Amino acid sequence: MVAAIIAGAAVAAAAYAGKYGIEAWQAFKLRPVRPRMRKFYEGGFQATMNRREAALILGVRESVAAEKVKEAHRRVMVANHPDAGGSHYLASKINEAKDMMLGKTKNSGSAF
């Protein structure tokens, strides 16, 4: 007799848990979708780097102070340095972007 009561209580508890689980899942699916990551630039590199592309690479505005360019260059290079497993190509593009933003380039294009 006691076993039947315990079994009935267990079945009722499982039914209520299932009901609330389904309701929670439906509420979760109905919530508005929020982007989990920032939207990144989907295009590739241009043949000749311009100021806009340099600003996109460094993550700064086109009309930014030299100090901010240097800070952004350091931040991006730490994340993409070849000695830390980054790409030599990306490192060269990052350096080219810094030179472009600081006005140290003759706009001759990339070495690659």
Swiss-Prot record:
It is found in: Mitochondrion; Mitochondrion inner membrane. GO terms for cellular component: mitochondrial inner membrane. Residues 53-112 form the J domain. Keywords: Membrane, Mitochondrion, Mitochondrion inner membrane, Transmembrane, Transmembrane helix. The chain crosses the membrane at residues 7-25. Its main location: mitochondrion. It is a single-pass membrane protein. Component of the PAM complex, a complex required for the translocation of transit peptide-containing proteins from the inner membrane into the mitochondrial matrix in an ATP-dependent manner. Probable component of the PAM complex at least composed of a mitochondrial HSP70 protein, TIMM44 and TIMM14. The complex interacts with the TIMM23 component of the TIM17:23 complex. This is Mitochondrial import inner membrane translocase subunit TIM14-2. It comes from Arabidopsis thaliana.
